[in-house]
């Protein structure tokens, strides 16, 4: 048995290192783990992985002083009108986040980018909604002036540290960062990454870590039982011992409301594409975000991104065709 992330699924499958997850259908389904987990752990229509943990991005807020929001404009309005009182004097910042991270901010335009199709594995299926993405980029470019955040000086850890002390109202985190907050007394809520406008949606990316059984092992059934034990039977130990967000969605936990919301976001998320060579696409998305945030022209940044995606997709298709001959 070995562990891998969902983006490594195709490589593992083509290397012959995946044995089908077929012994426990009553356990490994969307009712227990959610849609994204099942998609991430599958390839070619068959389930191979045993989902263990996941990572995704979302907005977290301090429930003592703040409420859930839907859009970035709502946060801007709160920031512009926020007043310090005796009750909230511990708060030193309304909102800060890491604008440099592709993974955190994929959600900004994630609803309008299709990479790999519904199963995140078809290299021939890549599509972009130009109109919507440009609207997202236009608003994203305004955030630097709105919040005065230099993307080169603010990190995810900085934001998690500040939020965990109760000194910030809102920030964007990933699931791995929750371990730091869960050991504090901060009463927090979780909601989707804020959309860039009332007429726009956000959709976070997720990566799933899974156990996979090697078909060449001496006892495949025993290995499958161990994979089940790790990902299901003893899944509740993952958060307390490994400080990871458990992929199993039906556990009873201390912060049940936040846990359920996090799993809803995870289940509905965009699964990071699983095919070999897709890394170039995400790197180009990150570059596009950086360009517009730093003051670059939106049309130019998008055009460069779209052209590169088209070329990369074409090259991937040609390589795939050659490999099948």
Protein language model features and the residues they cover:
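Short helices/loops that flank or line small-molecule/ion binding pockets
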Residues: 2, 15, 80-84, 156-171, ...
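Hinge/lid segment of periplasmic solute-binding proteins
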Residues: 3-58, 73, 190-194
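A ligand-binding cleft/hinge motif common to bilobed small-molecule-binding domains
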Residues: 7-13, 173-187
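Extracytoplasmic/periplasmic solute-binding protein
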Residues: 46-52, 57, 76-125, 168
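Short glycine- and hydrophobic/aromatic-rich loop-to-beta-strand nucleating segment
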Residues: 57-60, 211-213
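Glycine-centered hinge/linker elements that transmit conformational signals in sensory
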Residues: 122-153
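Extracytoplasmic/periplasmic substrate-recognition and gating elements
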Residues: 183-243, 287
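Conserved C-terminal helix/tail region of periplasmic/extracytoplasmic solute-binding proteins
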Residues: 263-325
């Amino acid at each position: 048995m070995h562990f891998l992330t969902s983006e490594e699924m195709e490589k593992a499958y083509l290397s012959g290192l995946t044995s089908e997850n077929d012994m426990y259908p009553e356990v490994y389904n969307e009712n227990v783990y959610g849609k994204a987990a099942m998609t991430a752990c599958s390839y070619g229509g068959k389930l191979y992985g045993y989902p263990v943990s996941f990572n995704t991005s979302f907005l977290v807020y301090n429930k003592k002083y703040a409420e859930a929001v839907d859009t970035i404009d709502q946060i801007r309005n709160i920031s512009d009108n926020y007043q310090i009182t005796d009750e909230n004097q511990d708060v030193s910042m309304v909102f800060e986040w890491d604008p440099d991270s592709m993974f955190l901010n994929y959600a900004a335009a994630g609803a309008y980018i299709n990479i790999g199709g519904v199963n995140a594995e078809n290299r021939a299926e890549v599509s972009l909604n130009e109109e919507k993405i440009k609207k997202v980029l236009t608003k994203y470019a305004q955030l630097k002036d709105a919040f005065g955040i230099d993307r080169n000086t603010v990190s995810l850890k900085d934001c998690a540290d500040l939020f965990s002390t109760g000194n910030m109202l809102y920030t964007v985190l990933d699931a791995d960062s929750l371990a730091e907050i869960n050991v504090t007394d901060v009463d927090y809520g979780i909601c989707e990454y804020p959309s860039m406008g009332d007429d726009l949606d956000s959709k976070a990316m997720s990566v799933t870590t899974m156990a996979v059984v090697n078909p060449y092992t001496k006892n495949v059934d025993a290995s499958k039982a161990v994979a089940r034990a790790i990902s299901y039977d003893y899944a509740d130990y993952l958060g307390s011992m490994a400080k990871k967000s458990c992929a199993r969605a039906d556990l009873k936990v201390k912060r049940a409301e936040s846990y359920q919301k996090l799993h809803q976001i995870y289940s509905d998320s965009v699964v990071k594409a699983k095919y070999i060579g897709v890394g170039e696409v995400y790197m180009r998305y990150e570059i596009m975000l950086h360009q517009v945030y730093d003051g670059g022209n939106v049309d130019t940044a998008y055009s460069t991104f779209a052209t590169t995606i088209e070329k990369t997709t074409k090259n991937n298709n040609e390589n795939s065709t050659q490999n099948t001959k």
